[in-house]
Amino acid sequence: MSIADIRTDYAQADLSETDTAADPVTQFAKWFDEALHAEVPEPNAMGVSTVGENGRPSSRIVLIKDFDQRGFTWFTNYDSRKGRELEKNPYAALLFHWIALEREVRIEGRVERVSAEESEQYFQSRPVKSRLSAIASAQSAPIADRAALEAQYAKVEAQHGDSTPRPPHWGGYRLQPEYVEFWQGRRSRLHDRIAYTLQKDGQWTRQRLQP
């Protein structure tokens, strides 16, 4: 079979303006809850896209750890590529793709670091081996081989044991949404797209987009 011949005709659900909430965070919470109940694999996995000083984008999958009216929060190494790019250009795009429900959510906005207290609280809630990995890994930096990486981990484990201080270069980011789009697959590629845009007065406008 040719790659060009691979296609699915989506028919599970529809999405109308009257079905959606007045604000996108409430609507996202509804869809996220439905993804959980549908047992979608890792519904908290999202693509995070950033842009470097050279104007070139980069993307990776990250796990969201919280969301509320303040924004969408994840944690990472501030010295990683995404961290360095966000320091220079504090805007990002998030993408959730729940293929089992034929749904997608795109979120764009400005990104800020969360407080040190919030980062500390989450870091200490992680499994100890995850905390050790965060200390041992200089994320995005080259390394000779797997053995060298495991040696770094073993050294950190011997040094800290279960007492794992949060590294100063590790913490959270929160994206404050300015644009959110909900996509529902439909038959014949006539998909439903409902977009929310944040206005200067803090209110959200909502409109349907052509597929």
Curated annotation (Swiss-Prot):
PROSITE patterns: PYRIDOX_OXIDASE (PS01064). Homodimer. Pfam families: PNP_phzG_C, PNPOx_N. FMN binds at R60, I61, V62, L63, I64, K65, F75, T76, R81, K82, Q139, S140, W183, R193. Substrate binds at R7, T8, D9, Y10, K65, Y122, R126, S130, R189, L190, H191. It comes from Herminiimonas arsenicoxydans. It catalyses: pyridoxamine 5'-phosphate + O2 + H2O = pyridoxal 5'-phosphate + H2O2 + NH4(+); pyridoxine 5'-phosphate + O2 = pyridoxal 5'-phosphate + H2O2. GO terms for biological process: pyridoxine biosynthetic process. This is Pyridoxine/pyridoxamine 5'-phosphate oxidase. It comes from the Bacteria. The gene is pdxH. Binds 1 FMN per subunit.
